[in-house]
Amino acid sequence: MAFSLVKLRTSNSPIQIGSRWCTAKARWVLCLLLTLSTGLVADKATASGAECDRLASIAADPDHQSAPVDYNGIDGPKVIDACREAVMQFPDNGRYWVQLGRGYLKIEQGNAMLEAFQKAKLLGYPVAWFALAVVYHTGNGIDEADLNRAEILYKEAYQRGVGYAALGLARLYDEPGSPFFDLEKAGVWESRFDALKDRLG
């Protein structure tokens, strides 16, 4: 951690160190501790965000910041601890909310999962539409699937730049017995996903 050196004067005039005000009569140790505490809080916030990314990054997210973690690799309690801390520090970061939702999904807390995904959607985070589409497509974490809602959400996610939504639509349309079964549509969306695959990784 970098420090700024300040020469203390013998007068009572205030001296700013970091964002705290100290006087020359105050012990420099106290001033230093106050400055360090501010830096430590910032470091902790950054660490919780990085840990949330490390534990629950989603491949479908065009803005993922760490190597993606598949569903089997999710450790629900650890993800919840790290990502809950991250959203407390950065409540407007949609990525952390989506990743928090993955933690809740893993431990089958459906209501908390939906709240986290919906929060990310309200923040305008694109992959939130995809996460909700998968939930309504599969029925995981909710009472029952809603394919109409899933289709709408997949298409909105795709329009917002989430390429994996094309794969979701292909799977939605290629399920025999489903009211959405349509091999022609499935082929169109599969082709769109294949065209993006190299870029998506």
Give the location of each predicted region.
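N-terminal secretory signal peptides that target proteins for export/translocation
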Residues: M1-A24
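Bacterial N-terminal signal peptides
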Residues: K25-G39
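N-terminal leader/linker segments that initiate helical-solenoid repeat arrays
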Residues: D43-A82, V87
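Hydrophobic face of amphipathic alpha-helices that form TPR/SEL1-like repeat modules
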Residues: L100-K106, A131-T138, G168-P176
